[in-house]
């Protein structure tokens, strides 16, 4: 055992002998960050995200969509939901990343294309929004109209 390893062990034993870190209740487990509920599936988390989004609780929605993509990284709809929740919070760069991942997984995903284009408009990137509109038009005329209107308002 190296000298460094022995020092770490001695330091750890010293902390334990003193009752643990200052103020810590060593009879209770340390708190952990919120995580996916036991037995929860990606679909469960996606649906949780949709409910939070419908309630306009975008922070909770983003957390649920993050759990969904952690459970199933290829879940394009969850990446899109994450992008939407982030965009609603004004987190545009993160939102773009989520939309790009959704579109990497499902290149002809009309909803993700519309929302990506709307995010570009929010960022003032109208040329990128127009290129996105060009991709969207043959896929979904209604969504293309909505994006076109957003671009026109963004001028």
Feature map (PLM): residue ranges:
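Canonical tetratricopeptide repeat
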Residues: 81, 115, 149-150
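Structural marker of alpha-solenoid helical repeat scaffolds
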Residues: 71, 105, 138-139
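Helix-start (N-cap) detector for alpha-helical repeat units in TPR-like alpha-solenoids
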Residues: 42-43, 76-77, 110-111, 144-145
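Position-specific recognition of the canonical hydrophobic site in helix A of tetratricopeptide repeat
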Residues: 53, 80, 84-87, 104, ...
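Terminal, low-structured helical/coil segments at or just beyond the last alpha-helical repeat
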Residues: 2-4, 10-11, 25-35, 126-155
